[in-house]
Amino acid sequence: DGMWKLETERGSWASLPNYMVSLLKAWYGDYAMKENEYGFQWLPKLGGNESLTVTIERAKKGEVDGLLVFGQNIAVTNPNTGWGRTAIRNLKWLVVCDLFENETASVWYADPNGPKPSEVQTEVFYLPTNSCLEKDGSVSNTERLMQWHDRIKEAPGECRSDAWWTYQLGKRLKAMAEASGLPRD
């Protein structure tokens, strides 16, 4: 009964079940019924420790098919960069969305101690993002400071914001889901 039993909660958390029912009904429409917990079981769930270190170790063992990497350089996150690079080369696919082509995006051809590019089977997609100087909007961070700024120049080439790339991916996934015919989609 998980999230539906929150009798001890106070404040806004006490409204979580009502909020979730409304959200799930908005997502799943007529398929969200009390009998199927409004589709709650269709949502992806964390299976345990999903930290970056554990995920990279799982990738190294071949247990992860692909990764979406936004604004990180996981090939050199750990002091043992060979460990991260080897893990990345075990993926079937890798999407890197970053301001610059970094070691993660170029792991298939620019690893000084790695295999030849022809031996790497990972399909890498590099999506260039724009910097904060190249986009309008609000910016916030962990210090709870919120700022608004105007773009001072256009982004070069095909650079887009992380949000733009994510939205485009979401549109395509939605189209695929609509074609599946499954109630959860």
Please place each PLM-identified region on the residue numbering.
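Non-catalytic alpha/beta scaffold blocks inside enzyme catalytic domains
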Residues: 2-185
